Amino acid sequence: MKRTGPTDPNLRRLIRYLRKKSNEYGVKIWKDVAWRLERPRRQRAEVNVSKINRYANDGEMIVVPGSVLGAGKLEKKVIVAAWKFSETARRKIIEAGGEAITIEELIERNPTGSGVRIME
């Protein structure tokens, strides 16, 4: 059976945008994130805020090529960019003093991807 990729038009647009920016700025991180978002939904990343709290440092930029979920607590001030956020995850990130932004907003702020970590 032929692999078709994601059918969500917004996700397809984001993947094209990531590839374009990867070529434009000559950085591989955005191409890697695009590849991870292209995977089937059942293989896409689902990260709880407790995992972000465990592995991220204060002030760090984290990109999640999938969903951020609200299980656990977050005590660090981090910038998290993801495809989707649950309501509780977004609330917990903001309450901890961090930011919950889209992947496009992260690329606008940091087009070269320096200091950005991918978390799955």
From Swiss-Prot:
It holds the Pfam family Ribosomal_L18. The keyword Chloroplast does not apply. Signal peptide: none annotated. One of its GO terms (molecular function) is RNA binding. The keyword Ribonucleoprotein applies. Keywords: Ribonucleoprotein, Ribosomal protein. SUPFAM superfamilies: Ribosomal proteins L15p and L18e. One of its GO terms (biological process) is translation. GO terms for cellular component: cytosolic large ribosomal subunit. InterPro entries: Ribosomal_eL18, Ribosomal_eL18/eL18-A/B/_CS, Ribosomal_eL18_arc, Ribosomal_uL15/eL18, Ribosomal_uL15/eL18_sf. Belongs to the eukaryotic ribosomal protein eL18 family. Part of the 50S ribosomal subunit. HAMAP family: Ribosomal_eL18. This is Large ribosomal subunit protein eL18. It comes from Pyrococcus furiosus (strain ATCC 43587 / DSM 3638 / JCM 8422 / Vc1). The lineage of its organism: Archaea, Methanobacteriati, Methanobacteriota, Thermococci, Thermococcales. The gene is rpl18e.
